[in-house]
């Protein structure tokens, strides 16, 4: 006699004729789509509005802020009606906008209709012009810093590195057979890496050698190739490579470099990129198994963490890393050569929980490795627990930077130098650990971000025109329906 048993698959009950019980039940295959879309509604849209912050006119007199948003819970048509009428299943999106006139001190606040927002069905699809469509998730390269290697004709190892964000300009490092390290900024013409180091603050040859080590042959070779000699010349040379044909000035170059890498509106590592960056550039895995070339002292307490000549195990390396130590000199050995010192430099991020008595993730929202210099400022400012919590919340974006930092760039160059000595590892970029799924919520967020950046330019121009006409300026007149709908419509 055939035994039939009921099997629950989501909301559906099916009858199974199998003799062997299932080990794992059928997963909810549309859960990823629905969870991603819900994240976009609850957090993704908020991040887009937060990135915009305030829109100022060219004179700095008028400021438009997006305070809040809400989605109407009652769509115009049901799913069935949308299919019958060839309509789009959507709900109105309303945004509360506040206009501040600095000259008169007048504040106007209005709720503005920004267009129809596409809604997801229970099946994880969208209804567009009566047709049911699904947004396919993308498998993309994860943001972070990744290292590779190749060999030249003589069999010499040539190391490369790529620092790619979720959104923004790329940094690509490469070396040639003459031991010169080059860098490409945003896929432009290459220049010696020391030129970029000068532009970021290491002005003289002595400062660069002192920071990375006097006896690093690739730093010395890059310095010989470098035609600049100080920070100003470095900034001008970087600007010439990025903007050929334009007259370079120190101010323009500094502003352009800041916009490329340190402006959150133009550069974004995202949370996963920051995690990968911190994990790669930390000290722990790079100093474990080596002997300390000098005493290692905790910067906050003055405690001796490792004595000169002591071999550092993994537990000790993790303790050193989380104590806020950013530079460790270790001894590296090569066959037939005497041990020589090598400076290992981290990006200065630590586990914040080690420095506070309360749960920093639950009570202050610090859920990633945080910048040690900022933690130290907070500890020096106050010892009161409640004040520390408040300062952690206020400085969250500085503690966990979504952009690349100068320390990240310095540490990435140091990691590249260490590969020559067998310190660190190269990455397999096709490994799934270095890939991530970009699902529907993030794709929608990126589309809205593009739309808002276009709309921002139109609003700024409208501010200037209406200000010159001396007419009544309201948030509604600046953000009218045709403008917002044209730029925010998701294709």
Positions of PLM-derived features:
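N-terminal non-catalytic structural scaffold regions of very large proteins
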Residues: 1-488
């Amino acid at each position: 006699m055939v035994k039939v048993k009921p099997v629950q698959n989501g909301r559906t009950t099916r009858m199974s004729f199998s003799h062997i019980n299932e080990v794992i039940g059928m997963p909810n295959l549309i859960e990823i789509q629905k969870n991603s879309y819900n994240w976009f509604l609850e957090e993704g849209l908020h991040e887009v509005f937060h990135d915009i912050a305030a829109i100022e006119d060219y004179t700095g007199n008028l400021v438009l802020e997006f305070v809040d948003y809400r989605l109407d819970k009652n769509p115009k048509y049901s799913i069935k009606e949308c299919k019958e009428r060839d309509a789009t299943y959507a709900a109105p999106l309303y945004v509360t906008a506040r206009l501040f006139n600095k000259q008169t001190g007048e504040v106007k606040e209005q709720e503005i209709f920004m267009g129809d927002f596409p809604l997801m069905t229970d099946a994880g699809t969208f209804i567009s012009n009566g047709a049911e469509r699904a947004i396919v998730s993308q498998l993309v390269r994860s943001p972070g810093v990744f290292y590779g290697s190749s060999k030249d004709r003589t069999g010499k190892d040539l190391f490369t590195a790529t620092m790619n964000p979720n959104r923004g300009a790329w940094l690509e490092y490469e070396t040639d057979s003459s031991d010169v390290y080059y860098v490409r900024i945003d896929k432009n013409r290459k220049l010696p890496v020391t030129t970029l180091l000068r532009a970021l603050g290491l002005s003289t040859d002595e400062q660069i050698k002192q920071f990375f080590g006097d006896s690093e042959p690739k730093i010395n070779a890059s310095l010989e190739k470098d035609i600049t000699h100080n920070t100003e010349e470095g900034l001008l040379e970087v600007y010439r490579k990025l903007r050929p044909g334009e007259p370079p000035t120190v101010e323009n170059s500094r502003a352009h470099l800041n916009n490329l890498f340190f402006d959150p509106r133009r550069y974004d590592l995202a949370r996963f990129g920051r995690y990968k960056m911190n994990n790669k550039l930390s000290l722990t895995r790079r100093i474990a198994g080596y002997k300390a070339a000098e005493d290692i002292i905790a910067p906050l307490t003055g405690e001796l963490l490792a004595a000169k000549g002591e071999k550092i195990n993994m537990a000790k390396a993790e303790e050193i890393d989380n104590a806020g130590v950013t530079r460790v000199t270790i001894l590296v050995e090569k066959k037939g050569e005497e041990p020589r010192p090598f400076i290992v430099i981290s990006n200065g991020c630590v586990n914040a929980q080690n420095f506070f008595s309360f749960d920093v993730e639950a009570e202050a929202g610090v859920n990633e490795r945080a910048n040690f210099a900022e933690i130290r400022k907070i500890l020096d400012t106050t010892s009161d627990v409640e004040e520390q919590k408040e300062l952690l919340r206020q400085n969250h974006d500085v503690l966990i930077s979504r952009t690349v930092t100068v320390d990240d760039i310095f540490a990435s160059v140091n990691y590249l130098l260490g590969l020559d000595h067998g310190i660190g590892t190269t990455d397999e970029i096709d490994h799934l650990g270095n890939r991530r799924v970009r699902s529907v919520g993030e794709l929608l967020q990126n589309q809205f971000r593009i739309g808002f950046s276009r709309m921002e330019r139109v609003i700024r121009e409208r501010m200037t025109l209406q200000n010159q006409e001396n007419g009544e300026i309201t948030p509604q007149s600046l953000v009218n329906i045709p403008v917002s709908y044209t730029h925010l419509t998701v294709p």
